[in-house]
A protein has these predicted regions:
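Long, low-complexity or tandemly repetitive, helically biased scaffold regions used
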Residues: 1-170
């Protein structure tokens, strides 16, 4: 990948992660667990579900903030360091993107078949309040193109790093 293309990818990813972080932080600052549970009806059924959901969102926020800060460092350097930038993009894929699509609390899941039809591909385990549904679906519309752009970092980047290590050993 050329340095120009890599830098452009870092800039685009930085912008998207910053947008995601702002949206998630705004939501988390406005809601409480008690408020979500009371808006949903049955407290016993929804308290654990929303607790997991909020925990996943807080983790996602931390991962995205860390990643966009590291991308910012990479982009501000006087000389663009390609290896560092690739490492950060790898971490974006494996922390931010994977944690969005595979949340630890399993509060929703992705149905990849729906993505090809142009429909929202997130399926919620329980009916959530409209604001949370809107946030999650909005995030998926930002994460989906980012995931496609960073697909290289799922497996090919690791293979490249392993080949480089083997060359240095030989």
């Amino acid at each position: 990948m050329s340095a120009t293309h890599l830098k452009q990818l870092c800039e685009e990813t930085y912008t998207k992660l910053k947008k995601i972080s702002m949206e998630v932080e705004r939501f988390l600052n406005q809601v409480t667990l008690a408020g979500l549970v009371s808006a949903s009806g049955d407290p016993e059924e929804f308290e654990t579900y929303y607790r997991k959901y909020l925990s996943d969102l807080r983790h996602l926020l931390v991962y995205c903030e860390n990643a966009y800060e590291r991308l910012g460092v990479s982009l501000r350097r006087a000389r663009f360091h390609e290896e560092f930038a690739e490492e950060v993009l790898y971490q974006v894929y494996h922390t931010c993107i994977n944690n969005f699509y595979y949340p630890k609390g399993e509060v929703y899941e992705e149905d990849g078949r729906l993505a090809y039809t142009g429909q929202d591909c997130i399926i919620f385990r329980k009916q959530v309040i409209p604001e949370l549904q809107q946030l999650t679906l909005s995030l998926s519309r930002v994460f989906e193109p980012m995931r496609n752009d960073l697909q290289y970092y799922e497996t090919d980047y690791i293979a490249k790093k392993q080949m480089q290590q083997e060359k240095t050993r030989a």
